[in-house]
Regions:
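Catalytic glycan-binding domains that act on GlcNAc-containing polysaccharides
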Residues: 14-146
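Sec-dependent signal peptide recognition
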Residues: 1-8
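Conserved small/polar residues in nucleotide/adenosyl-binding loops
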Residues: 147-154
Length: 154
């Protein structure tokens, strides 16, 4: 729960965004951070992968749970933080600030998150639960089939 609150606080910078609700907020933040510099197709792929995980037993059953999934540690003062580089989505635990700076991309991410969550966008990923930038080669990527979207594979 603490992770979800930290995530929401970093994204809810406008009065309009404060009324989005946790699912839209978490998905929009994931789209922004994972694919903010990608095409609309890349952003949609990230959103669909996030939602596809919610529908599977092996992942948390909420969008925020999926986005913030990963091991955590607690400091002596009781603060909880994600373990660096051990999250499902690398931006969440890379040690960098998670504050959107591009309002146009942030607004587009919110718009797309709403569309995906309200079933108004076709899932062209065919139920994909993973993706990666084609400049990296994670160990999990070898035994799977791909759909290629410019810099991201799903």
């Amino acid at each position: 729960m603490i992770k979800e609150l930290i995530l929401a606080a970093s994204f809810l910078m406008t009065p309009e965004a404060m009324q989005l609700g946790p699912d839209v907020t978490c998905m929009a933040m994931n789209i922004y951070m994972e694919a903010g510099n990608q095409s609309v197709a890349g952003k949609l792929a990230v959103g669909h992968v996030t939602l596809n995980r919610v529908d599977m037993e092996r992942y948390p059953s909420s969008v925020c749970g999926v986005v913030t999934q990963g091991p955590t540690y607690q400091t002596k003062s009781g603060m909880t933080f994600p373990v660096k580089w051990r999250c499902q989505f690398s931006w969440f635990c890379d040690g960098k600030a998670d504050k959107p700076v591009d309002s146009i991309t942030r607004n587009e991410s919110i718009y797309l998150a709403k569309k995906i969550l309200h079933n108004r966008m076709y899932d062209f990923t065919d139920g994909a639960t993973h993706y990666h930038n084609d400049q990296v080669s994670p160990a999990w990527s070898r035994p799977v089939s791909y759909t290629h979207l410019r810099a991201h594979e799903t």
